[in-house]
Amino acid sequence: KGARLQRALISFFLDAAREAGYLEIQPPYVVNAASGYGTGQLPDKEGQMYHCNEDDLYLIPTAEVPVTNLYRDVIFNESDLPIKNTAYSACFRREAGSYGKDVRGLNRLHQFDKVEIVQIQHPDHSYEALEEMKAHVQSLVERLELPWHILRLCGGDMSFTSDRKSVV
């Protein structure tokens, strides 16, 4: 039952993102170091990432890493923006376990699944895009009739490239 529920939820979130104008991407689960640096995961979060020594590659901590790196060397015209992508992926982090007062009640795993939405937007419109994405996620949680709240992360929980970050 759990596997079918998970598959249904993944489809629900991907379908809703596509209906909201996001292009679905099937990201790779293994990336090079340049991809990690390009999204601020490296060097900041290297201790939480799994490294494949023989090939000098990393398992993705989030689909954001390969999705945004699809555009790493692209220069956009303003008329091309926004670029909206969604992706489902397994994610891999070394932060497994349940520990400490800050994660009470959470059971952290080495592997977990996520559906992400990503926008590439002109800097003048980035905060507006962030609010749009938060509203999109909130509407989905409400459609599922789940209780929710927004947690705004503090600076110590974000990569050095982040200005704001929220979790619904």
Language-model features and meaning:
Residues 1-168:
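TRNA-recognition modules of translation machinery and tRNA-sensing kinases, especially anticodon-binding
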